Amino acid sequence: MSRGSGAGYDRHITIFSPEGRLFQVEYAFKAVKAAGITSIGVRGKDSVCVVTQKKVPDKLLDQSSVSHLFPVTKYLGLLATGMTADSRSLVTQARNEAAEFRFQYGYEMPADILAKWIADKSQVYTQHAYMRPLGVVAMVLGIDEERGPLLYKCDPAGHFYGHKATSAGMKEQEAINFLEK
């Protein structure tokens, strides 16, 4: 009774399958798509614009309490696509990290430093058996006095890149194909 070549490797997030896959990371990416929303971010010459869908999962919920766009500081924002609880946890930690950065260095945390911090944190979650990867893709947006508008995308595997335009969520590839035109 064979369970396939990936049998057993999806129970432990720190063990690679024979194909070189971390199933728990793949499940985190699937959780982002399963949230059923798509988010898009576009960087202009003097601005960053992000849009996302707003799906209220229950008729009894207050619509104003459902959001995927969060302020981190006066100059940084975070658009989180994926599991709501993971998003809120990540935003709380990002706000604390940004406040600590400002206290320690005396100036606001740049968007690329926050994106790197989120990516590093996400990558650490793939290394320890007592943690699980967050089911969220975060777009970090900000305006820098020297470099202008910035847009970064961080994923559950710990990757982060700067983008002119990007997308995350259920219709990510379709949105990226449209943005590339």
Give, region by region, the residue ranges found by the protein language model.
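Long, low-complexity N-terminal extensions
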Residues: 1-181
